[in-house]
Amino acid sequence: MDFSSTVASQLYTGAILPESIVILTLIVVLVGDLIVGRARSGWIPYAAIAGLLGSVFALYLGWDNPHPVAFLGAFNSDNLSILFRGIIVLSTAFTIMMSVRYVERSGTALSEFICILLTATLGGMFLSGANELVMIFVSLEMLSISSYLLTGYMKRDPRSNEAALKYLLIGAASSAIFLYGVSLLYGLSGGKTILSEIALGFTDPQGGQSLALAIALVFAIAGIAFKISAVPFHQWTPDVYEGSPTPVVAFLSVGSKAAGFALAIRLLVTVFNPVSEEWHFIFTALAILSMVLGNVVALAQTSMKRMLAYSSIAQAGFVMIGLVAGTDAGYSSVIFYLLVYLFMNLGAFTCVILFSLRTGTDQIAEYAGLYQKDPLLTLGLSVCLLSLGGIPPLAGFFGKIYLFWAGWQAGLYGLVLLGLITSVISIYYYIRVIKMMVVKEPQEMSDSVRNYPAVTWTAVGMKPLQVGLVLSVIITSLAGILSNPLFVIADQSVTSTPMLQVANHPTEQVVAQVDSELVGVAIADH
């Protein structure tokens, strides 16, 4: 076996074909913009979306890959990571659709915005499949630093600068906390960095090792909770969401959150299985706090972006029910809910962007009477908000049903009942917006709606917004009806991922996982 084939067998670069396509797209956008100039850069968003769709197709081709482990065990392209990476890529594609008009109108460069967004996408994709401590941290920082830049991209807007500074300071602290937890794992394992190898040394922790592992768990969860906006690590979310460019907020609410949950599942199930009772308890507390605080505080909000920020916190609490369940049904429901949450949440943000572009405000009171001036926008926002509230037969209803049923089967009766109660609370503030939009009396119409410009889709960048809105509404409506096939796909990704069976057969499963993840090395040796 020659040198090139040895390297190829050890690295198995085919596992990162989707990421390679995104990297190529990033280079094309960057170099193309330098060559043709900003004045003729109208093709850039469409090239970026085409590249992202190509990445989705590459993910489809990688489904049921018999050799998912690459880079000497550092990256795992199993079906679980494929679905999470797909959610992140699709969220980026929709974000670009809603960004074209928004960024152009702000007077900033669209190509640079898309390049930073694609870099954040790469960080999220690598984080979803990262199986090694260094790669986890590098991917996390790649996603985080790009997110800081995106948050402060509107340099002329003081609110954007303030949001970026807050996000940077709190994010840097959370990264340091997470890194300390990771360093404890490195030391406890005797210098191991592959997750499954670390887990092999913790199959029966004793005394001080068990205590140190619990301490590492607390620090690791603190870093993860920041990424998914779980209470009490949520303080940055409302301010950052309100001050950041709305397309960036949309990406953070879905893409960044999906990457955080992917990391949580892989890290907790693989490494922290010996202290599973502890991390289940912690995430139960986080879920309770997130559902209660997120939904209750959202009732008092006057800004749509702040309301959706607290809604995002509450939605993370609902998703954590599936994580705490710790069963195949629980993990499947997490994936399914994030998949439908992608469309209903980004659809809602698309409507917020359209309204703000036409009126210059995002205050909830200014939506009064919108139905009389823009029925399509009213319909789209209503469908997405009702789905977020869990109203049947929309996608959000079935997503919550799967989460609550998985929690009920796992014996989490109190957590499920609290989820049901807080879901009812959430319906109130969603319905409040819808009721305001459909008022019929002219005197109840807000000043912004009374002076609402004529609805037109001919301006530059409006067509992608229209396409994104229509797609979001259609998928949100149909995903509820077609929930069973989608849930079957989510379930297949879970049942075909060996690491998720570690809890049932710790020693045997971990050993088997180590063997499978080092297959590249074994092939190279032969």
Curated annotation (Swiss-Prot):
One term of GO molecular function: NADH dehydrogenase (ubiquinone) activity
Keyword entries, A-Z: Membrane, NAD, NADP, Plastoquinone, Quinone, Thylakoid, Translocase, Transmembrane, Transmembrane helix, Transport
Membrane topology field: Multi-pass membrane protein
InterPro entries: NADH-Q_OxRdtase_suN/2, ND/Mrp_TM, Ndh2_N
Domain of life: Bacteria
Catalytic activity: a plastoquinone + NADH + (n+1) H(+)(in) = a plastoquinol + NAD(+) + n H(+)(out); a plastoquinone + NADPH + (n+1) H(+)(in) = a plastoquinol + NADP(+) + n H(+)(out)
EC number: 7.1.1.-
Cell compartment(s), UniProt: Cellular thylakoid membrane
Top-level EC class as recorded in UniProt: translocase
Main location: membrane
Subunit relationships: NDH-1 can be composed of about 15 different subunits; different subcomplexes with different compositions have been identified which probably have different functions.
Function in brief: NDH-1 shuttles electrons from an unknown electron donor, via FMN and iron-sulfur (Fe-S) centers, to quinones in the respiratory and/or the photosynthetic chain. The immediate electron acceptor for the enzyme in this species is believed to be plastoquinone. Couples the redox reaction to proton translocation, and thus conserves the redox energy in a proton gradient. Cyanobacterial NDH-1 also plays a role in inorganic carbon-concentration.
Matches recorded under NCBIfam families: NDH_I_N (TIGR01770), PRK02504.1 (NF002701)
Family per similarity comment: Belongs to the complex I subunit 2 family.
Protein name (record): NAD(P)H-quinone oxidoreductase subunit 2
Organism the protein comes from: Picosynechococcus sp. (strain ATCC 27264 / PCC 7002 / PR-6) (Agmenellum quadruplicatum)
